[in-house]
Design a protein with these regions (language model features):
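Short coil/turn motif common to extracellular beta-sandwich-like domains
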Residues: 11-21, 103-113
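Solvent-exposed loop segments of extracellular immunoglobulin-like
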Residues: 28-37, 118-131
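Conserved Ig-like domain signature around the intradomain disulfide
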Residues: 20, 31, 62-71, 112, ...
């Protein structure tokens, strides 16, 4: 069966009133993508090329939850994606800044350091790569994420988002994006 990927564009926790797009893609022929939220069918889209996009705008808590995509031909479900968690939260922390060393263009095999800088001593952060379902967690206290021996598969659009864990999780906005190219 074809594998389906599901991801958010742009990735990250969304603020109330914010917007994002759920992307479902697979190497499949014509058919339909059915989007499920918390096990309930919410929308169906015909396949356009190899992907379907479901937009969320003016987000509220009703948009939060566990999403998955099913690929259907007729009545047969041919494949299911992993589950994507969408969170809708107010942003209370300052916006972080993402930088990359040694630079935006690196040679294959090099080590790359992503640094997420935020004006908050106790924040932990996630590094996002567009197209990937999960963020990469930074070790708390360390805001550097090291990618060793980079390859073409590491290319893409990165961003970061930070949080504090107290009685409640508090979130920052998502940083501006940064594109990494591997030569």
């Amino acid at each position: 069966a074809p594998a389906i990927s599901i991801f958010l564009k742009p990735p990250g926790v969304i603020p109330p009133g914010g917007s994002t797009t759920i992307c479902c893609s697979c190497r499949c022929d014509n058919g339909n993508f059915v989007l499920y939220q918390n096990g309930q069918q919410v929308r169906t889209l015909e396949l356009r090329g190899s992907r379907a996009e479901f937009s969320i705008s003016n987000a509220t808590q009703k948009d939060a939850g566990a999403y998955s995509c099913h690929y259907r031909k007729g009545d047969a479900v041919l494949a299911r994606s992993e589950t994507l968690e969408i969170q809708v939260q107010e942003f209370h922390l300052p916006e972080p800044v993402l930088s990359v060393l040694p630079g935006h263009e690196v040679d294959a095999g090099a080590d790359v350091v992503f640094r997420c800088t935020i004006a908050h001593p106790k924040a932990g952060c996630f590094l996002y790569l567009e197209g990937r379902i999960q963020g990469f967690p930074f070790l708390s206290g360390e805001r550097d994420y090291i990618l060793s021996h980079v390859h073409k598969g590491n290319e893409g659009r990165y961003s970061c988002q930070c949080f504090t864990r107290g009685a409640l999780f508090e979130w920052s906005a998502v940083s501006k994006t940064l594109d990494l190219a591997v030569r």
